[in-house]
Amino acid sequence: MLRKVFYISDGTAITAEVFGHAVLSQFPLEFDALTIPFVETEAKAEAVKAQINDCFITTGERPLVFHSIVKPEIRDVIYSSEGLDYDFLNTFVAPLEKQLGIAATPAMHRTHGKANEGYEARIDAINYAMENDDGQTMKHMDKADLILLGVSRCGKTPSSLYLSMQFGIKAANYPFTEDDMDNLKLPDALKRNKGKLFGLTIDPERLHEIRHSRMSNSRYSSLRQCRMEVKEVEMMYQKERIPFVNTTNHSVEEIATKILEITGLKRHMF
């Protein structure tokens, strides 16, 4: 039976999940996780406590409880459960109060709510990424923070959306297709924004697998075509001195982190 894990918050529970996943990923084990957001009252906290206690009675193992709860009275209810408690906010707040010489002033949902100035940056960036996905339009490239390039199915769209959703970065993306390969060059709109360009590439064998799952037995998905496109695009990156990374076997989170590290782009939100 898998060890039970609870991610609990009086907000979205995103913080509890992120920290919890980061900690648990250090162990070569699988877990049975349950996320419970918006535990905003003592009554809700008591109901969650009952779930935790029932799990302990059923399994004989104390559930792992990761939480980021602002209100002390709600937090105390969770503390009193039979779970093994990991309180991220309280762990860091008390030492910081001492170092900064000021008492914390907790605010509900401050880290993810609409009151956060980064909220508008997130929405604007998501809208921009969707409107400027896959070269749909070249009219607004000047407004981009970043323009991702690459062959079809190398990870441009998920990377653009992740950067916009997670960091508020306006990321457009432009595809190089089979028709471009005979005379591969940068369109004028991209030349004008050369400092914003960043290339993605991928191992041809992996690209072949991805395309084959969508359009099997086509020229588009053939290994020969994949090898040719990747080779041509990488040569263009080198000729134009466009930085690029290989996305093969990397998660979208890892790709985004590499892009930010190489480009030095600043996050617009946290």
Swiss-Prot record:
Reactions catalysed, as given in the entry: [pyruvate, water dikinase] + ADP = [pyruvate, water dikinase]-phosphate + AMP + H(+); [pyruvate, water dikinase]-phosphate + phosphate + H(+) = [pyruvate, water dikinase] + diphosphate
UniProt keyword Transferase present: yes
Assigned keywords, A-Z: Kinase, Nucleotide-binding, Serine/threonine-protein kinase, Transferase
Keyword Transferase: yes
Annotated ADP binding sites: G150, V151, S152, R153, C154, G155, K156, T157
Function according to Swiss-Prot or TrEMBL: Bifunctional serine/threonine kinase and phosphorylase involved in the regulation of the phosphoenolpyruvate synthase (PEPS) by catalyzing its phosphorylation/dephosphorylation.
Protein name as it appears in the record: Putative phosphoenolpyruvate synthase regulatory protein
